[in-house]
Amino acid sequence: MKIIAGLGNPGQKYDKTKHNTGFMTLDHYLNEKGLSLDKDKFEGHWTKQKINGEDVILLEPQTYMNESGRSVSQIANFFKVAPEDVLIIQDDMDMPIGKIRIRANGKSGGHNGIKSIIRDLGTEKFNRLKIGIRHPKNTTVVSWVLTPFNDEQQKLMDDAFDTSVKIIDDFIAGRDSQYLMNKYN
C-alpha cells in the first residue's frame, strides 16, 4: 500500500495559493483519474483506491500546513504503511516556479509541513515530490506563499501538474526513488 499526500492549508481563503501547491497537484491527479476524496478521518480528506492494481491512499491533511504530520502519521499508522511507501507533494521556494524535484529523504529545507511530518513519522526517510514556487522578489515570504499564481506562472504549474501525474503513477507502480530521480529530476 502507498500513501500520496498533498500538502496545503484548508479553507477557501488558501485555495489556489502557492503554499497549496500540494493540494492543487493532488486535485489535478484526482481529476485526471476521475476520483474524489470521499472520507474525512485522520484529520484529513482522503480516499482509498485501487490504482493499476495497487492499494493507494490519497490524502489532503486538514490540520494546516505546520501540523500536516499529525494527519500523515495517523493514516500511515492505521494502515501500517512504511515511511518509504509515502510520497509527500510539497511546494519549494528554493526552486523556480514549476520545476520538479524528487527526493527520497532528507531534512525539511525549512518547510514547516515537512518538519511536522519528520517529527510525527519519526524519520526523514519518506519520498517527496517538490514543486518550485521560487522565493519572493519584492514581498515577504508569507505574502508570497499566500497569493495565487499569475497567468504566466500558472502555465508553468499546469505543466508541473501534468508531469506529477506520471510521477505519482510511477511511484504507485513501485518504481523506486532512484528511478524517479533519474527520470524526472
From Swiss-Prot:
Q: Which CDD domains match?
A: PTH
Q: What is its main location?
A: cytoplasm
Q: What is its EC number?
A: 3.1.1.29
Q: Where in the cell is it found?
A: Cytoplasm
Q: Which amino acid positions bind tRNA, per UniProt?
A: 14, 64, 66, 112
Q: What class of enzyme is it?
A: hydrolase
Gene Ontology BP terms? protein quality control for misfolded or incompletely synthesized proteins; rescue of stalled ribosome
* Reaction catalysis annotation: an N-acyl-L-alpha-aminoacyl-tRNA + H2O = an N-acyl-L-amino acid + a tRNA + H(+)
The cross-references to Pfam families, in alphabetical order and at most eight, read: Pept_tRNA_hydro
Which GO MF terms does the UniProt record name? peptidyl-tRNA hydrolase activity; tRNA binding
Keyword Magnesium in annotation: no
Keyword annotations from UniProtKB, A to Z:
Cytoplasm, Hydrolase, RNA-binding, tRNA-binding
Coiled-coil-forming residues are: none
Where are the catalytic residues?
19 (proton acceptor)
For this UniProt entry, what's an example GO CC term?
cytoplasm
On whether RNA-binding is a keyword of this UniProt record, the answer is yes
Family, as annotated: Belongs to the PTH family.
Q: Tell me, in a sentence or two, what this protein's role is.
A: Hydrolyzes ribosome-free peptidyl-tRNAs (with 1 or more amino acids incorporated), which drop off the ribosome during protein synthesis, or as a result of ribosome stalling.
**Record protein name field:** Peptidyl-tRNA hydrolase
Organism per entry: Lactobacillus helveticus (strain DPC 4571)
What gene does this protein come from?
Answer: pth
